[in-house]
Amino acid sequence: MAALGEPVRLERDICRAIELLEKLQRSGEVPPQKLQALQRVLQSEFCNAVREVYEHVYETVDISSSPEVRANATAKATVAAFAASEGHSHPRVVELPKTEEGLGFNIMGGKEQNSPIYISRIIPGGIADRHGGLKRGDQLLSVNGVSVEGEHHEKAVELLKAAQGKVKLVVRYTPKVLEEMESRFEKMRSAKRRQQN
């Protein structure tokens, strides 16, 4: 566990666990196939993604703040890590460079539309497309450590525009919800067109 004021770094703990697994394998006290399976999990990209999400969520809190705020950040980081362990639609951290050409994606949704904020389009040849980390259908959870869950569309746009140098996004892939949103918006547009005619 990190001391007060230290950032949480789980990578060291995971490496130590792998070392201990290797010692156990050499001892022959535990069936090797179980130890090897656990070692594969700890060394997997998935475990690394869960660790990154946990650390990112934990780091969004001011360490010098009250114990209650730190406990809340730890709880949120734990929930994010458990959500990631579900395997499907787990949160991911995506970093994109911010240049004059923009970020190369569009968003839709927001509190005013009673929906989460989603990546609705990846612009072909743009930064997001070249980077490859974002997908159409990703729900935008935070921008540079600021949550956009339950926020207005404009707040997310402002955070993305204000970012300098690079943008750190936490996203979760949920394409079905985006499809439902787009279908709902299309029905609303069709109803409006019928009213105008």
From Swiss-Prot:
GO biological process per UniProt? exocytosis; neurotransmitter secretion; protein transport; regulation of synaptic assembly at neuromuscular junction; synaptic vesicle transport
Domain L27: residue ranges: 10-65
One Pfam family of this protein, by short name? Answer: L27
Please report the stretch or stretches of sequence annotated as the PDZ domain.
Answer: 93-175
Tell me the GO molecular function terms: protein-macromolecule adaptor activity
Tell me the Gene3D superfamilies matching this sequence: 2.30.42.10, L27 domain
Identify the SMART domains for this entry.
L27 (SM00569), PDZ (SM00228)
Per UniProt, subcellular location reads as: Cell membrane; Cell junction
Q: Classify the main location.
A: membrane
* PROSITE patterns attached to this UniProt entry: L27 (PS51022), PDZ (PS50106)
Provide the membrane topology annotation: Peripheral membrane protein
Q: Which UniProt keywords apply?
A: Cell junction, Cell membrane, Exocytosis, Membrane, Protein transport, Transport
Segments carrying motif Kinase interacting site? 1-13
Q: Which InterPro entries match?
A: L27_C, L27_dom, L27_dom_sf, LIN7, MAM_complex_regulator, PDZ, PDZ_sf
GO cellular component term, pick one? basolateral plasma membrane
Subunit structure of this entry? Component of the brain-specific heterotrimeric complex (LIN-10-LIN-2-LIN-7 complex) composed of at least APBA1, CASK, and LIN7, which associates with the motor protein KIF17 to transport vesicles along microtubules.
The UniProt function text for this chain reads: Plays a role in establishing and maintaining the asymmetric distribution of channels and receptors at the plasma membrane of polarized cells. Forms membrane-associated multiprotein complexes that may regulate delivery and recycling of proteins to the correct membrane domains. The tripartite complex composed of LIN7 (LIN7A, LIN7B or LIN7C), CASK and APBA1 associates with the motor protein KIF17 to transport vesicles containing N-methyl-D-aspartate (NMDA) receptor subunit NR2B along microtubules.
Q: Spell out the family assignment given in the record's similarity comment.
A: Belongs to the lin-7 family.
Domain statement: The L27 domain mediates interaction with CASK and is involved in the formation of multimeric complexes and the association of LIN7 to membranes. The PDZ domain regulates endocytosis and recycling of the receptor at the membrane.
Entry protein name: Protein lin-7 homolog C
Question: Could you tell me the gene encoding this protein?
Answer: LIN7C
